[in-house]
Amino acid sequence: MNAIPTIITERVDDIPLLLEQMQRMGLPTLFDTHFPTHGNWTGLSLGWVSTIWLSSMLSQGDHRMVHVEPWVAKRLWTLGTTTGQMVTRVDFTDDRLESVLRRLSHDERWGAFASGLHQHTVRVYALSPERVHVDSTSAKAYATVSDGGLFQFGHSKDYRPDLPQVKVMQAVLDPLGMPLATDVVSGERADDPLYRPCIERVQASVGRHGLL
C-alpha cells in the first residue's frame, strides 16, 4: 500500500530572497565571529538567529519580538530549506531574542562587525569606494522626553521646536547610497562633534583615506 504523502503549505513571500542576500553578505558568519556565545548556548547559532530575525523584520515590517516565534513556527520548512540549518521555534522565544540583544549591545564589537561587513561587501560586489557622503538629519516624534533618553528638544530642522527629536548621522557610499556608518544620538546634540567619529569609523572599515 502506498504511503500517503505529507503536504506542507507555508507562505514563502520574500523570505528566500532576503536570506540569500544576507548569506551573500556573510551576515551569519560575521555575527558569530564578532559576538561569540558561551558554552551553554544550544540550538541555532546567534548568527543564524540574528539573520532569520532580520528577515522577519524586513518581510513583515515589524520589529516587535512577540511576533517572531509564531512567525517562525509557520515557516519552519521554508527557513530550514533556505538556510540549510535545523530551525526550531524554541530558537526564537522572547528569552532567546533578549539574550541576542544583550550580546549585540556592545559598541566596540559593533565597530569591528561593521568593518568586516563593509570590507566583505565592497570586495564581493566589486564596489568602487571613491567618494563617501556624510550628513546628519533629525526625526521628530510625539514622544515623552526623559533624562538620558534619545528624544530630546533641540534645534529643529523640521521647524517644530515644540516636538522632541532624535538625531541621525550617516555616511553613505556615493553614488550607490550604501550606508557605511550610522550613529543615532539624542536630539539636543550638535552636528559638528558627530562628524569626526563617523569619518574615522568609515576610514577604518574601508581601509582608505581621502574619500570624504
Specify the residue positions occupied by each region the protein language model found.
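Dynamic "connector" segments at or just before major functional cores
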Residues: 1-152, 162, 169-188, 195-196
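Hydrophobic "anchor" residues on beta-strands that sit immediately upstream
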Residues: 131, 211-212
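Short, basic/hydrophobic alpha-helical segments
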Residues: 192-211
